[in-house]
Amino acid sequence: MSTPSARTLPLSVPRASALYIGALFGPGLLLLPGLAAQQAGPASIIAWVALLGLSAIFAAVFAALGQAVPGAAGAAGYAGAGLGRRAATMTRWWFLAGVIAGAPIVCLIGASYVTALTGGGPLARGAVAAGLLLAVLGLALGGVRASTMAQLLLVALLIVVVVTAVAGSSPAVRPANWTPFAPHGWLSIGRAAATLMLSFVGWEAVAPLTGRLRAGQLSRVIGIAFTVTAVLYLGLAVATVSCLGRGANLTVPLADLLQLAIGPAGRAVAAAAALVLTAGSVNAYISGASEMLRELTAVPSQKGPNGPGHAPRLSAHVLLGVIALVGLVLLGLSALRLADIVALVSVPTAMFLCVYLSCTAAATRILTGPARVAAAVAVLAVLAVLAFCGWQALLAVAVVAAVASYRSAAAGRAMRTVSSSFRPVQPDPIIHGG
């Protein structure tokens, strides 16, 4: 869910398409196809197709928002434009909580590929993930930030790995792997959709780019981005079911597919790619979350040469510390088998679903015509997927919403206090009277 460059220069169709694809692709593809197949079996393909349809609706809604509210700063800006300041604050907090809960999960994905190569159980995987998380946080503490070009290169690496794995493993297709089609019942498709949703966020990050595209370019860019993601997503999902089957270890599907494609070296290639993708993605997430934190923690102050200003904002070092603390706790729970990967993934998924819920709900008030209808459909679809995230994730969402509401109310009181302190002094009617 990386944020594109803020420059206002016009974009060409190829570069805009690359930025769109870069916002949609992420390291979740290293895990989620296998996780969905574990949850729903071959029927997980239905979840993929349904979410691709929902993704097309998201694309239309956020493109329309980008044109209707060109000055909005991403998801929180859209929520604020349609639903008000408190909704914008909640959206920022949900995004921030999604990054805090999601960063260690991404590191756990990378660690799974390392231990699939080197051997080791949950404790070893947790230790590798903790080391990876602390290393990335250390780089961020030192000021290292992934540029837009670096993020696009990481996406290109992921695409190459996926294409190689899918195409190379095709001789291993087994039709028998498609039966039984829904071994865990039809409701498992909803649970798989909730898991996969993490791979379909990103349209909101590139919506501001609509103002940098010339007339007629937007539909082409969205069409290219959607086609590329749909082909790769479905190709990977079909290959996971067709080639690996139910008996395989589906926590590292790309490693297994690459092993089928290029031989024993496939696991080493997958592990190396997973480490690079994990580090780059977490770094990009932290960069976006740091800016979000600065917006959230700007405290009104009475100091300043021109009246009310802002006190120094909360340091991003606090964010890194919180991510480290929360991350080590979550990784510890995973290492001790007190929380499975599905439960861990559901928390950031629910947070980002709430971000989408606030944006699409705002869109029903901002947009008109077919775009408003699409936004209403998106609201219903997001609510349906959110219902399958599990009570733990929904409880986490409620806690974050309560914190956001409290912070928003406190900020409102502070602003009113500052404003009252700088009211103009009225003339004394006795001294200055006519």
PLM-predicted stretches and their roles:
Residues 1-34, 38-43, 56, 60, ...:
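Membrane-interface "cap" regions at the ends of multi-pass membrane proteins
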Residues 2-6, 119, 123-130, 152-271:
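Helix-loop-helix junctions that connect adjacent transmembrane segments
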Residues 20-28, 88, 154-168, 225-233, ...:
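Small-residue-rich segments of transmembrane alpha-helices in multi-pass membrane proteins
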Residues 34-40, 111-125, 145-154, 269-276, ...:
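Transmembrane helix-loop boundary segments of multi-pass membrane transporters
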Residues 57-133, 137-141, 155, 274-295, ...:
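Hydrophobic transmembrane alpha-helices that form the core helical bundles
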Residues 76-80, 84, 116, 223-285, ...:
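TM-loop-TM module centered on a large, flexible mid-protein loop between adjacent transmembrane helices
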Residues 124-172, 183-185, 222-226, 345, ...:
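Membrane-interface loop-to-helix entry segments
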Residues 348, 361-434:
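A generic transmembrane alpha-helix motif of multi-pass inner-membrane proteins
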